[in-house]
């Protein structure tokens, strides 16, 4: 089971590399929104 599956696609609290992995596994709007927020934090 991947990190993305465990967190239901919410990876904004995870390192960028894992967030990218989740983006590929679960490309849904909620995740994309969280990913953009995470990207802006860097």
From Swiss-Prot:
<keyword id="KW-0472">Membrane</keyword>
<feature type="transmembrane region" description="Helical">
    <location>
        <begin position="15"/>
        <end position="37"/>
    </location>
</feature>
<dbReference type="GO" id="GO:0016020">
    <property type="term" value="C:membrane"/>
</dbReference>
<keyword id="KW-0812">Transmembrane</keyword>
<keyword id="KW-1133">Transmembrane helix</keyword>
<protein>
    <recommendedName>
        <fullName>Putative uncharacterized protein DDB_G0275485</fullName>
    </recommendedName>
</protein>
């Amino acid at each position: 089971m991947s990190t993305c599956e465990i967190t239901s696609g919410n990876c904004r609290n995870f390192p960028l590399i894992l967030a990218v992995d989740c983006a590929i596994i679960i490309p849904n709007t909620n995740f994309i929104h969280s990913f953009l927020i995470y990207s802006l934090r860097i």
